[in-house]
Regions:
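An alpha-helical, amphipathic repeat domain used for nucleic-acid recognition
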Residues: 1-166
Length: 166
């Protein structure tokens, strides 16, 4: 006699799925900070039902294990430390699922001066002799724009570095 039940996947109850999803979320959050939408996406990839995902995200939010405001502030500091500008960081935060109000709150950190960060990045990377040539100045401006700095921040960094060396 053949046991046919061995071929069928075992159906877990809602409570069992919830427990497994919570365990997965805790392991995931122990490794690194996540936005709520990022955690939900990872749970979806694991195949959990939407009701389970919502319950787990609410559970994690209740214990403050997942907090979009905290995640946004951390991502802004981390991006600035990597030499990324505000445009690039905003784009990444939107991609991670934060709304505009949360992103604006994350950027309200008084210790970050984007103009000085652009200048510091340019000081580390650019040769001051390059700044005498217009084409090379434009190359460095394009570099800063590619890193997510605004045109104004890039022009400030170029002129400030040039002024320091005169």
């Amino acid at each position: 006699m053949v046991d046919e039940s061995a071929d069928k996947p075992v159906e877990l109850t809602f409570e069992e799925q919830l427990a497994a999803a919570r365990a997965f979320a805790m392991r995931s959050l122990a490794r690194r900070e996540s936005a709520e939408s990022e955690l939900a996406r990872r749970l979806r990839q694991q195949g959990y039902q939407e009701e389970v995902i919502e319950a787990v995200v609410d559970y994690c939010r209740g214990y403050n294990w997942v907090n979009d405001e905290r995640y946004g502030a951390m991502a802004v500091r981390s991006g600035a430390a990597k030499g990324h500008g505000p445009i690039k960081i905003r784009f990444e935060l939107r991609r991670k699922g934060l709304d505009d109000n949360q992103i604006d709150a994350a950027f309200e950190q008084p210790e970050l001066d984007w103009f000085e960060l652009a200048l510091a990045l340019l000081e580390r990377r650019a040769n001051v002799a390059d700044l005498a040539d217009f084409k090379l100045r434009m190359k460095w401006l394009k570099y800063l724009l590619g890193r997510g700095f605004t045109q104004e921040q890039g022009r400030y960094a170029l002129s400030a570095l040039q002024d320091r060396e005169l």
